[in-house]
Amino acid sequence: MRTMTRTRNSWNLRPAVAVGGLALSAALLATLFSDRVAPLIRTAVADATPTPALLPLGTPAPDFTAAAHDGQKVELSKLKGKWVVLYFYPKDDTSGCTKEACDFRDNWSTLQKKGVAVFGVSTQDNTSHKAFATKYSLPFPLLPDDKGEIAAKYKVPLMGGLARRITYLIGKDGRIAHVWPTVNPVGHASEILAQIEPTAAKAN
């Protein structure tokens, strides 16, 4: 009888443990997909998407027109004669995207001296862009691409509505000079400057 009692007790405990496990799982899911954590997960997923087939070097950069967060109208075709950095990033005010934007900010003086125009592109709207730019004193325009039209022209994949982190360097001739299909947010501005300097020297 004792054995039977123990067996019954053990069986009686199992549903309680199972129910507790379900409750714990639900709590974990609620935490993971909260407003604070879910964007970080989506950003990480966007960064981890497989490397796509991007525009080849020497290809004319696809033209586009966009209204930046600061009110200026950006038309790529009118920027010929300048170096243009078009960097796609997943989401405003997330860890990697903030590091990348602040890296451009911290190298802004040097970029300006080299005649480089910088544009950040993501799928958030200009309300989000303004808040992001103001919070971190970003001196360059952020472009809204809520429909993914600019991303599509540059073959940048969207994952969960967020752009993969990819950078295009467009030469003064309006053609693709270099592409970074994967980007380390820290030190990226220096990578771009290092790419521009030898190219500029050859042109001279």
Q: What do these predicted regions represent?
A:
Residues 93-136, 146-152:
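Structural microenvironment flanking redox-active thiols in thiol-disulfide oxidoreductases
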Residues 141-145:
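Short acidic-hydrophobic, aromatic-tinged amphipathic segments that line or gate anion-handling sites
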Residues 60, 83, 162-164:
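Short, small/polar residue-rich loop motifs at catalytic or cofactor-binding pockets
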Residues 2-63, 67, 202-204:
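N-terminal targeting signals for export/organelle localization
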Residues 163-204:
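Thiol-/selenol-based redox modules, centered on thioredoxin-like
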Residues 55-56, 64-84:
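A short beta-strand-turn-helix
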Residues 76-98, 104:
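Short active-site neighborhood of thiol/selenol oxidoreductases, capturing the structured segment around
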Residues 138-140, 158-168:
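Structural micro-motif
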